[in-house]
């Protein structure tokens, strides 16, 4: 999957 720019700040970092 793609990694977002603010992944480090969001829970989404788990799937990025």
UniProtKB/Swiss-Prot annotation:
Location(s), subcellular: Secreted
Organism: Hastula hectica (Sea snail)
Signal peptide annotation: none
Protein name per the record: Augerpeptide hhe1a
Transmembrane parts of this sequence: none
GO annotation, cellular component aspect: extracellular region
Keyword annotations: Disulfide bond, Secreted, Toxin
Tissues in which the UniProt entry reports expression: Expressed by the venom duct.
PTM comment, free text: Contains 2 disulfide bonds.
